[in-house]
């Protein structure tokens, strides 16, 4: 179905038909057709309110609602194929409604502009997809919690500057990402408070002379409140930008996590194994096992960042109130929504099918310079000022590297040559599991602390 050769919704004021190339250029139906459910949902609420306010008759409202419900099914089943000459999805639906029920279809738009119509559609879309992204994040949080529990007693290297820093519980590592993604989910929940405000009834930007009841429209659509200023209701896209920012934050965290997966699964690190079901090979090099899913997630973060910058740039400098520039908000919104949800979903599945190489990690962490901090803190407990302890430990590390003797195997006499305070107790500090277990501070990497973090996290899932 197409509205080819039909008058555009706004065309009656003009003496010449809209240039076809201009129409093709300005048409958005290929993008905003994704809003057809929300558009019909908003229209049904609007016409219900119109009938209750006696602006249209109940019989007219029933005919309009029945027609809209049929059109929704036609669009869902692909029986209506929007054409660029339809201009936008609102035009597609209204023209099809007119074909079905005649002139009464024209009453649907009473007291409504495409400005508040599309603002309503967008908020309904955001509300639905915020829920979808939160659900995907909840699944990822569940996987992270499972990993943290399973590997709570496994020791890995903690890194700073991509240099081995200190031994930590692997569970602590997974709980770090759990905490990040939990904040991402919480941010989306907070955004819902601002999204869940209905702009329907603001009309073009100045309101209407008809006795509309915006509160009733909002109630029918499940909104928690209504707009306070009709100009603001149709002319800002800050909630959309905030959502894109939240998506960018999610993708930033995923990208960092993906980088760890890529590095740790490499031959050089060899800490982590990705399931064959989530890896690819090379068309030339038979030995390759590539972390392509993680790489794609890392790459898609750039797209989502770009969408955020695109929206900020589109809105920069626009005079109040509505401007056609805002039509360009749909592609960034739809792309970031789909990318974020799909990335979180596939990353969760991939992560669930990874395993840490515990034997290799145990060997690597047992004789590594990452225990140097334990030496410094041992000296602090011997009442040596930390700066002096740091300097002494640095010299011990240099000697260890030059002599080729691992820290746990340095003779006591050699330790004493650096500081007389050393005694046999130093060797108890130079074990990775003892180092992790000895941590005493809140939120630390000790096994006990990680278990506390896990138990607290279970309450948030």
Swiss-Prot record:
GO biological process: arginine biosynthetic process via ornithine; L-arginine biosynthetic process
Main location class: cytoplasm
Domain of life: Bacteria
GO CC term (a single one): cytosol
Family listed: Belongs to the lyase 1 family. Argininosuccinate lyase subfamily.
NCBIfam families given in the database record: argH
UniProt-recorded name of the protein: Argininosuccinate lyase
Annotated source species: Chlorobium chlorochromatii (strain CaD3)
Gene: argH
């Amino acid at each position: 179905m197409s509205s080819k050769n039909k008058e555009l919704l706004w065309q009656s004021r003009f003496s010449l038909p809209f240039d076809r190339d201009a129409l093709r250029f300005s048409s958005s139906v290929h993008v905003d057709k994704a809003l057809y459910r929300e558009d019909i949902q908003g229209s049904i609420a609007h016409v219900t309110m119109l009938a209750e306010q006696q602006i249209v008759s109940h019989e007219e409202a029933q005919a309009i609602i029945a027609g809209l419900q049929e059109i929704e099914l036609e669009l869902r089943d692909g029986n209506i194929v929007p054409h660029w000459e339809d201009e936008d999805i609102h035009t597609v639906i209204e023209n099809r409604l007119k074909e079905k029920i005649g002139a009464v279809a024209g009453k649907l738009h009473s007291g409504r502009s495409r400005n508040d119509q599309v603002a309503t559609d967008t908020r309904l879309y955001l509300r639905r997809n915020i829920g979808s992204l939160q659900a995907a994040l909840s699944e990822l949080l569940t996987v992270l919690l499972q990993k943290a529990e399973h590997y709570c007693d496994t020791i890995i290297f903690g890194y700073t500057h991509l240099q081995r820093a200190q031994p930590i519980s692997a569970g602590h590592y997974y709980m770090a990402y759990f905490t990040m993604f939990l904040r991402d989910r919480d941010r989306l929940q907070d955004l819902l408070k601002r999204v869940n405000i209905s702009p329907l009834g603001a009309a073009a930007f100045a309101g209407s002379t008809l006795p509309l009841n915006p509160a009733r429209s909002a109630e029918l659509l499940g909104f928690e409140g209504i707009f306070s200023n009709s100009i603001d209701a149709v002319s800002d896209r800050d909630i959309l930008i905030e959502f894109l920012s939240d998506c960018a934050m999610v993708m930033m965290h995923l990208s960092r996590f993906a980088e760890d997966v890529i590095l740790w699964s490499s031959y050089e690190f060899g800490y982590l194994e990705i399931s064959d079901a989530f890896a690819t090979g090379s068309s030339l090099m038979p030995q390759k096992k590539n972390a392509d899913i993680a790489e794609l997630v890392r790459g898609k973060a750039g797209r989502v960042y770009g969408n955020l910058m695109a929206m900020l740039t589109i809105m920069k400098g626009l005079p109040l109130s509505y401007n056609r520039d805002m039509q360009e908000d749909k592609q960034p919104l739809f792309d970031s929504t789909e990318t974020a949800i799909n990335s979180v979903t596939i990353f969760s599945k991939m992560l669930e099918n990874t395993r840490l190489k515990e034997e290799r990690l145990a060997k690597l962490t047992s004789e590594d310079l990452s225990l140097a901090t334990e030496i410094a803190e041992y000296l602090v407990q011997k009442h040596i000022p930390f700066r002096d302890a740091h300097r002494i430990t640095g010299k011990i590390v240099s000697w260890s590297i030059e002599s080729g003797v691992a820290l746990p195997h340095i003779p006591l006499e050699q330790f004493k040559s650096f500081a007389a305070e050393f005694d046999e107790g130093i060797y108890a500090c130079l074990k990775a599991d003892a180092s992790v277990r000895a941590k005493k501070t809140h939120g630390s990497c000790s096994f006990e602390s990680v278990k506390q973090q896990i138990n607290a996290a279970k309450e948030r899932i």
